[in-house]
UniProtKB/Swiss-Prot annotation:
<dbReference type="InterPro" id="IPR040097">
    <property type="entry name" value="FAAL/FAAC"/>
</dbReference>
<dbReference type="InterPro" id="IPR054928">
    <property type="entry name" value="FAAL_FadD21"/>
</dbReference>
<keyword id="KW-0443">Lipid metabolism</keyword>
<dbReference type="Pfam" id="PF23024">
    <property type="entry name" value="AMP-dom_DIP2-like"/>
</dbReference>
<dbReference type="InterPro" id="IPR025110">
    <property type="entry name" value="AMP-bd_C"/>
</dbReference>
<dbReference type="GO" id="GO:0016874">
    <property type="term" value="F:ligase activity"/>
</dbReference>
<comment type="similarity">
    <text>Belongs to the ATP-dependent AMP-binding enzyme family.</text>
</comment>
<dbReference type="InterPro" id="IPR042099">
    <property type="entry name" value="ANL_N_sf"/>
</dbReference>
<dbReference type="GO" id="GO:0005886">
    <property type="term" value="C:plasma membrane"/>
</dbReference>
<dbReference type="Pfam" id="PF00501">
    <property type="entry name" value="AMP-binding"/>
</dbReference>
<protein>
    <recommendedName>
        <fullName>Putative fatty-acid--CoA ligase fadD21</fullName>
        <ecNumber>6.2.1.-</ecNumber>
    </recommendedName>
</protein>
<dbReference type="InterPro" id="IPR000873">
    <property type="entry name" value="AMP-dep_synth/lig_dom"/>
</dbReference>
<dbReference type="GO" id="GO:0006633">
    <property type="term" value="P:fatty acid biosynthetic process"/>
</dbReference>
<dbReference type="GO" id="GO:0071766">
    <property type="term" value="P:Actinobacterium-type cell wall biogenesis"/>
</dbReference>
<dbReference type="InterPro" id="IPR045851">
    <property type="entry name" value="AMP-bd_C_sf"/>
</dbReference>
<keyword id="KW-0276">Fatty acid metabolism</keyword>
<dbReference type="GO" id="GO:0070566">
    <property type="term" value="F:adenylyltransferase activity"/>
</dbReference>
Length: 579
């Protein structure tokens, strides 16, 4: 695999198994029952070459090609075509019609693309959007589904001086403006080997030949791109894909797609498991069987053990087992994957004393008397160390510190951000332990610890709440509240009379036959939350803000933007349900 890439694997598959189905996409916007479209390996490779030829007419090797297209097979062709042309692909989401997408605008200005790849369905809207963007030059707009890109082209594309960077994965920007992570072709190959070695450890890193990737995750997100596009090519597997909207409209589609696929392997963030468990009816799953499922990765956001339990319990009747659940840790700066418990072992939840965690130390306690945290197993590759971020000295076992990563899956850095690249990707250990490299290390910004040789994660350094001089992790408080409300929560600290106080923003549905009854239920919810936070965390809440679903600002991957929550709270911009 030394000189291999996603493109060389695609070419090989098109030659060896040209007529085998590679990618399928089910479109539920055309028809509620779904319209399924497919591509064989030969079709995919030919269309990729055609897009690459067209791109060469509009730019040069190392130019950027931004992808602004709806989720679908054309998005995959655009992504692969950009890399095939020697361009650096930049996967993004389509801006909402009639609005200015701050993130997309910032990325266009940052990358100065030669070409924007889109589809005929949204080309006019994209052209207008790009015309008003702050770019040095106006990029060409290329429709990937144009008829003339579907003809056979006999000539080859020669990449004599191709860039090492395959694509720019723009971060979701939960704590800052988005930055383009420079993911290389080698990063992809190495990270794929790492995740295979861990997820399929019982079979020596080898998956069943008829494994099917099932995914609705957006292609512009790291997990959606690697799982939905890259992994099927590298593994030679078939894929069953759809859009995030299709999943949100009807979560049962995800379960049904897995149950009707051979040896399905899938992934989703925590909220997806919650939605599927709550909004899938008995009729939806009648006659289905998940017994052949190879695993479902849970990642991208804080994983709540109670959610995984609800999912496992809900679908146990169709032979889903809790050892099929794969809680995983990763980040775009490490391509996508960093650590997970191996397939075949049930998720392990360990309880820790909250007071000790607040002090930065670790002490296990009896079940359900402390803060529940998921184990992410014993990290092997990449190398993981817990480090004191101030002294750059490794923390002893049982001490909370910053998670640092070292390995060939770690990206090159941030696009056109040398200082931030050095700060994040250039970590060096002081007095490293035997066998531990001095550097360079990726400083993840995540807080975690090692207990009994296993990795646990407590939250983001920048999100740490300091209330009355003590550290508290917002995810722990949010988890406590979610057990009561089931909706999205943001725990933030705000200055009140020169002291940091705890405020929680909570999404709930207003229920009741009358306004008086609805208000009575909201008061009961607030009382239950106040008592739970006091009991579990020893904290008084300065303000409980109950808001309608969809009020809390999030990133494109669904993570809560706590900094934005603080700003909205200070400006009194939340619409309170209780007046």
């Amino acid at each position: 695999m030394q000189n291999s890439s996603v493109l060389s694997f695609l070419r090989e598959r098109a030659g060896l198994q040209p007529d085998d189905e590679a990618f399928s996409f089910t479109d539920y916007e055309q028809d509620w029952a779904g319209v399924r479209k497919t591509l064989t390996w030969a079709q995919l490779y030919q269309r990729t070459l055609n897009v690459a030829h067209e791109l060469r007419r509009h730019g040069s090797i190392r130019d950027r090609a931004v992808i602004l297209a709806p989720q679908g097979l054309d998005y995959i062709i655009a992504f692969l075509g950009a890399m095939q042309a020697g361009f650096i692909a930049v996967p993004l989401s389509v801006p909402q019609a009639g609005s200015h997408d701050e993130r997309v605008g910032a990325v266009l200005a940052d990358t100065s693309p030669s070409v924007v790849l889109t589809t005929s369905a949204v080309a006019d809207a994209i052209a207008k959007y790009v015309d008003h963007s702050d770019t040095d030059t106006v990029p060409a707009i290329l429709e990937v589904d144009s008829p003339n890109l579907d003809v056979e082209n006999k000539s080859n594309i020669r990449l004599t001086d191709a860039p090492s960077t395959a694509y720019l994965q723009y971060t979701s920007g939960s704590t800052r403006l988005p930055a383009g992570v420079m993911v290389t072709h080698r990063n992809l190959m190495v990270n794929f080997q790492q995740l295979m070695a861990d997820y399929f450890a019982p079979t020596n890193g080898v998956a069943p030949l008829d494994l099917t990737i099932v995914s609705w995750l957006p292609f512009y997100h790291d997990m959606g791109l690697v799982l939905g596009v890259v992994a099927p090519i590298l593994g030679g597997w078939r894929s069953e894909l759809t859009s995030p909207i299709s999943f949100l409209q009807r979560p049962a589609r995800w379960i049904q797609a897995m149950a009707t696929s051979s040896h399905p392997f899938s992934a989703g963030p925590n909220f997806a498991f919650e939605l599927a468990a709550r909004r899938t009816s008995d009729a939806d799953i009648a006659g289905l069987d998940l017994g052949a499922c190879q695993g479902i990765i849970s990642g991208s956001e804080r994983i709540h053990p109670a959610t995984l339990n609800r999912f496992s319990d809900r679908f146990a009747r169709i032979n889903f087992r809790d050892d099929m659940m794969l809680p995983s840790y990763g980040l775009a700066e490490g391509t996508v994957y960093a650590a997970s418990r191996p397939k075949g072992s049930s998720p392990e939840v360990v309880y820790f004393e909250p007071a000790k965690l607040s002090e930065g130390t670790v002490k296990r306690c009896e079940a359900r008397t402390g803060a529940p945290l998921l184990s992410y197993g014993t990290p092997k590759s990449p190398i993981v160390r817990i480090v004191d971020s101030d002294t750059c000295i490794e923390c002893p076992t049982g001490r909370v510190g910053e998670i640092w990563l070292h390995g060939d899956n770690v990206a090159e850095g941030y696009w056109h951000k040398p200082e931030e690249t050095q700060r994040t990707f250039g970590g060096k250990l002081a007095n490293p332990s035997p066998g531990t490299p001095e550097g360079p290390w990726l400083r993840t910004g995540d807080l975690g610890f090692i207990s009994e040789d296993e990795l646990f994660i407590v939250g983001r350094m920048k999100d740490l709440l300091i209330v009355y001089g003590r550290n508290h992790y917002p995810e722990d408080i949010e988890s406590t509240v979610q057990e009561i409300t089931g909706g999205r929560v943001a725990a933030i600290s705000v200055p009140v009379d020169e002291t940091e106080k705890l405020v929680t923003i909570i999404e709930v549905k207003k229920r009741g036959d009358s306004d008086a009854e609805a208000m009575q239920k909201l008061v009961a919810v607030k009382n239950n939350i106040t008592a739970a936070i006091s009991k579990s965390h020893g904290l008084n809440v300065a303000d409980l803000v109950l808001v309608p679903p969809g009020s809390i600002p999030t990133t494109t991957s669904g993570k809560v933007r706590r900094t934005a929550c603080v700003e909205q709270y200070r400006r009194q911009q939340f619409s309170r349900l209780d007046g």
